[in-house]
Amino acid sequence: MLNVVIVGASGYAGAELVNYMHRHRFANIKKIFVSKNSLNIDKLFSDVHQQFKNIVDLRFDTIRNCTLIKKNIDAVFLATDHRVSHSLVPFFLSSNCIVFDLSASYRMNNKKVYLDYYGFVHEYEELLKNSVYGLAEWEQEKIKKANLIALPGCYATCIQLVLKPLIKENVLCDKNIPIINAISGVSGAGRKASLNNSFCEVSLQPYNIFTHRHTPEIIEKLGVPVIFIPHLGPFSRGIIATITCKLKPNVKSIDIHNIFNKFYKNKPLIRIYKKYLPSIKSVEKQPFCDIGFVIKDDYIVIVAAEDNLLKGAAAQAVQCFNVRFGFSETESII
């Protein structure tokens, strides 16, 4: 039985992590932590997330007390702000914990991105070089040996799962940039209240065009330029991405289906649609990424959907945990 700690368990993704790990047959949640200024310190998890009453009744502790138990911990999940994870990762690694970081703090190799997009100077360049990117379907062999797994962003997960097979098989026209329109539910902005996320203000609207934080992550990991247009949708959870690309001549629907089947046939959390297109309804509160596509002439439109809190965050983190420790990939997830 592995002892785990979850930091940031009061947030949406953190709560989903607690849910998954609570029912994990080979893990024991030792502690759940919140920030030192959190109003939830000493509250029960089920008082903050009432859907878990009589299911998970652990008590929140302040992160200040994490030093007291670090010697008895096998794995740590960080569902925290980027700057918080930036500081906590070296601490937990020095305590011989395997770290699963859901923030962006160790995702990218380019140190300058953190100043340009996240507003802080990254102080741990060596850890950046040694971190393993936790796109579970693509990095399993590296994840098995990693001490620091940096989980992808929610948009970045969905988009890469679509485009990586097509780029690897060289079926996209080199002269045309993939254009990505993606809509996320409001939970993607976190649990903290703000005017833009309030019930009366939320709408369907684009935001951070060309400047979204996931843009450099997507480009770095795909190795090709993209145009990424994120939108905020008037719903609580889920992401749907519509990606338009130009194909090389004579690429047919059967070719694309065979490509996706080649890479994802034995990947239980990827579902390929042959006749239909995905919807948010199909993935809400589910750990899957669903992919479908339509081709006309030399153009392909691929639609992908995921729950941003699950496959885009908590489910993928637990998937990486399972891979790292040699459990079934879907243990506690499905």
Curated annotation (Swiss-Prot):
One of its GO terms (molecular function) is NAD binding. The keyword Lipoprotein does not apply. Coiled coil: none annotated. InterPro entries: AGPR_type-1, NAD(P)-bd_dom_sf, NAGSA_dehydrogenase, Semialdehyde_DH_NAD-bd. SUPFAM superfamilies: Glyceraldehyde-3-phosphate dehydrogenase-like, C-terminal domain, NAD(P)-binding Rossmann-fold domains. One of its GO terms (biological process) is L-arginine biosynthetic process. Keywords: Amino-acid biosynthesis, Arginine biosynthesis, Cytoplasm, NADP, Oxidoreductase. The active site is at 154. Signal peptide: none annotated. It comes from the Bacteria. Belongs to the NAGSA dehydrogenase family. Type 1 subfamily. Catalyzes the NADPH-dependent reduction of N-acetyl-5-glutamyl phosphate to yield N-acetyl-L-glutamate 5-semialdehyde. This is N-acetyl-gamma-glutamyl-phosphate reductase. It comes from Buchnera aphidicola subsp. Acyrthosiphon pisum (strain Tuc7). The lineage of its organism: Bacteria, Pseudomonadati, Pseudomonadota, Gammaproteobacteria, Enterobacterales. The gene is argC.
